[in-house]
Amino acid sequence: MFARRYHALALFVTVAACSGKNAESTSVASAKVLTIATPADADALIPQLVQSTQGKQVTDLLFDHLAQPTNNLETVGDAGFKPQLASAWTWAPDSLSIAFSINPAARWHDGQPVRAKDVQFSLALYNDAAVASPHASNFIGIDSISVRDSLTAVVWWKHRSPEQFFQIAFNLAIVPEHLLAKEARATLAQSAFAQHPVGSGQYRFEQWTHDRQLIVAADSTNFRGKPNFGRVVWVVTADPTAASMSVLSGQADVLESVRGDAFVSARKSPQLHTIEYGSLDYAFMVMNTERTVSGNRRLFGDRAMRVALTAALNRQAMVSNALDSLGAVALGPFTRSASSVDTTMRQIAFDSVAAGRTLDSLGWKVDATDKLRKKNGKALKFELLVPSSSATRQKFGVLIQAQLASIGVSVDVAPLEPGMFATRLEKGDFDAALNMWRADPSPIVSLRQVWGAPHGKEIGANYGRYANAQFDATLDTAALVFSADKRKALFRRAYQLIVDDAAAVWLYEPRNFAAINARIEPTGMRADAWWADLPNWNVVGSRVATAKP
């Protein structure tokens, strides 16, 4: 269902057909429309449940946070933030609480005022075990939120930490209590609100045709002002070639990541900007440490096995083959742009001979008849999931398959449409998978969410169920240290621990180039969220569709 090609005529007929729904729609029906070609549909439209980049793009436009980061993405203190839902804030003398003043003009899209109790309710929803939010770990250390009055929410912490303000302002999306309080928490994803969300952002929800397109419309009376585009439309274009052609031909305005031949064509096109916007993305092969593979319980739970597979792969050769100059070998669960990173840290080097010796020592011997490594009559074989929407990860899957075959390891590459790929990761129904993660500006938040030890069924985004007590303890210490030098040293120690432990095979970090129609002047394209300032993007001309190249 994600293989549907983009049809410009169908898109514009659908958008126009929405114009008669209500006065709000009528006022923006003929306004400027921004069309985004996206490789996958949103996974959810409730912030507490969203895990995909596409879902995050939509919910960031529909819902507000207390404050918004500036482009420098500073995570210590509050200097790197500007007001969003909160018009002001006041620190307590002991820094254990912050009182946020809600803008009295803020309204939900149903007309109801936003109140402090909505802030309190939103945190409770993230932390409710029945909701099972993958973002619950982002709020570790926050004691509670109290309501001082209808427009003042006070956030309380158990301990002081350098990233207190960032922790609450960046991570807490505010949702309406009056519409969600009576919804069953365990089935929130199936609620009516999940299909027709109501936020307080500069865009309001309009239409969602699953696996095809999603539309939001400008909230013309929003307290932060009317955005420049009357509508934003995401068109699901799972085929990477079709997605590239849609922007090259002028049928779509934005493709957030363009690579290969499409990048060369986009560079040459006078109708497009190719804009590099930084990267907090890294790709890796996650291994399910609890899975029985090749007849061996917890095969990837063995560090020696993970190290052997890492050493068997020539990652530099793979990056050169698949990305050329548009990527670099990943060093760990971070990107080189992070200030906490030491790029000279020790790595597991490519050494296929050493990898073979390790596998021999683990009892996986090469069978002379078929050249496969076997143990107790079982071949060393695993399934590798890749999302069909990512041409780059599909290339890496084939390259990994070939390189591991050379040392007697059999890999079955299994492309899956994005929805099924995500579902199997979340359920733990996989041997290994090629995943991509957009790191949080805070190393504490990202590392806990993706690599912190699971707590029972609460795994966050740690799909491989990886656990390392030393790593977790080092992160916990770093979270409370105010000295910049000491924090950096602790982060380096944590990074070295997880790299030495081969928690994953760190594959690549891409250089992110967006292809954007030349009629548009984008602003504020942050490395963590290129869409962050989308309501303020400028339009300097009209879209002109051309014949497909």
Located regions from the model:
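Alpha-helical secondary-structure segments
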Residues: 115-122, 150-156, 201-202, 229-231, ...
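Bacterial signal peptide processing site
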Residues: 18-22
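Detector for C-terminal structural segments
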Residues: 209-213, 218-220, 278-283, 312-346, ...
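Gly/Pro-rich hinge or "lid" segments in bacterial periplasmic/extracellular proteins
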Residues: 68-76, 170-227, 231, 241, ...
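Aromatic- and charge-enriched surface segment that lines or borders ligand/interaction sites
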Residues: 88-132, 148, 154-156, 243-246, ...
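Surface-exposed binding/hinge segments that line
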Residues: 101, 135-182
